[in-house]
């Protein structure tokens, strides 16, 4: 039975209510947010420009779209900012109006919700535990002319796995040849050093739509900022016309403009994840009764080999919240997702897991 009503991580209010404590007393490993926090440059810009909330945002978000265009070296007409990447998912689903779409499971729940709202028939391609939850070329044969679009998350959520580039290119080529729109969710790709994703390939393939998020990497989930990128100017113009006006608030737009210029923050994040991510992964692998999947992003998928242990409930008693993956199609109650946080926070989780899985209290 599900412990929480929410279909997503980061629901610290509900978890704190279960415990009868304040939300700030919980250590949250359920939301995949950069533990370095918001860049200082962004925080300073927001404080210095608070009076911008007394005016309507620029309806065209000219400066934000220009900043995103410079960042990716593409025309601004290819980009449409949204109130978090989730809004962009719903925008592209309602704008394309597919009759039949394929989604890969386990995966982010909002693809299915957005497609269902558009009255679309949904087909599911199931990743296999036997393949380590990695996408394989078997999906190519499932891409048939009667499909209108395919949603892929790269790296995938909740597995953190990124398919090999040749396979992704083969999928993109097949989608183009069959007139299938390929929607690539690259929400977590910024955490992978020097991984450009598929935005550079858009000029040669207007069938590719890329979803991006600034929420996770720059730690601004409360502001909400994502965007959609596609090289078909006419199609993007249609998306723009159907989007709700003033979808992005003024502070979120400003945060995006400033964050994209902070290359030092990008380097600091990559350094943290390279060092702490590797250490945390190895430490988790040393724990008994736990299988850890080698994700590329800022979170890891775990499988507990003791079905009688509800890790989420047990850790919650120690005021630590992790994400149960039982509600992901294809996964079950043995699976959990944990964010990679600071070394001290990760040590606290490791000690709690060790205590639960072995019954041996960690040494002082």
Curated annotation (Swiss-Prot):
Disulfide bonds: none annotated. The keyword Lyase applies. SUPFAM superfamilies: PLP-dependent transferases. Keywords: Cobalamin biosynthesis, Lyase, Pyridoxal phosphate. GO terms for molecular function: identical protein binding; protein homodimerization activity; pyridoxal phosphate binding; threonine-phosphate decarboxylase activity. Gene3D superfamilies: Aspartate Aminotransferase, domain 1, Type I PLP-dependent aspartate aminotransferase-like (Major domain). Transmembrane segments: none annotated. Decarboxylates L-threonine-O-3-phosphate to yield (R)-1-amino-2-propanol O-2-phosphate, the precursor for the linkage between the nucleotide loop and the corrin ring in cobalamin. This is Threonine-phosphate decarboxylase. It comes from Salmonella typhimurium (strain LT2 / SGSC1412 / ATCC 700720). The gene is cobD.
């Amino acid at each position: 039975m599900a412990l929480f009503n929410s279909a997503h991580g980061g629901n610290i209010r509900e978890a704190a209510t279960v415990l009868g404590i304040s939300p700030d007393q919980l250590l949250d490993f359920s939301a995949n947010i950069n533990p370095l926090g918001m860049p200082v440059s962004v925080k300073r810009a927001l404080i210095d420009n608070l009076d911008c909330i007394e005016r309507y945002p620029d309806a065209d978000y000219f400066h934000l779209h220009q900043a995103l265009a410079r960042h990716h070296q593409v025309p601004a007409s290819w980009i449409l900012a949204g109130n978090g990447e989730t809004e962009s998912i719903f925008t592209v689903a309602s704008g394309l109006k597919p009759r039949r779409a394929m989604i890969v499971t386990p995966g982010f729940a909002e693809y299915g919700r957005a497609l269902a709202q558009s009255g679309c028939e949904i087909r599911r391609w199931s990743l296999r535990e036997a393949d380590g939850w990695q996408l394989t070329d078997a999906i190519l044969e499932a891409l048939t002319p009667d499909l209108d679009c395919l949603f892929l998350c790269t790296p995938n959520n909740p597995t953190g796995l990124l398919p090999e580039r040749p396979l992704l290119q083969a999928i993109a080529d097949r989608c183009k040849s069959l007139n299938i729109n390929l929607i690539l969710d690259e929400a977590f790709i910024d955490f992978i050093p020097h991984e450009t994703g598929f935005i550079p390939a858009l000029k040669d393939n207007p069938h590719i739509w890329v979803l991006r998020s600034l929420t996770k990497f720059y730690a601004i989930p409360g502001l909400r900022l994502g965007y959609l990128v596609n090289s078909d100017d006419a199609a993007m113009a249609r998306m723009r016309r159907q989007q709700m006006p003033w979808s992005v608030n003024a502070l979120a737009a400003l945060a995006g403009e400033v964050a994209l210029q902070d290359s030092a923050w990008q380097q600091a994040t990559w350094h943290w994840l390279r060092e702490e991510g590797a250490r945390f992964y190895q430490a988790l692998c040393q724990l008994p009764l736990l299988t850890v999947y080698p994700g590329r992003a800022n979170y890891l998928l775990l499988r507990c080999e003791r079905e009688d242990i509800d890790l989420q409930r047990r850790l919650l008693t120690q005021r630590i919240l992790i994400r149960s993956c039982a509600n992901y199609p294809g996964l079950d109650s043995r699976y959990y997702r944990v964010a990679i946080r600071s070394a001290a926070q990760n040590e606290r989780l490791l000690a709690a897991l060790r205590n639960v899985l072995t019954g041996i209290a960690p040494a002082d």
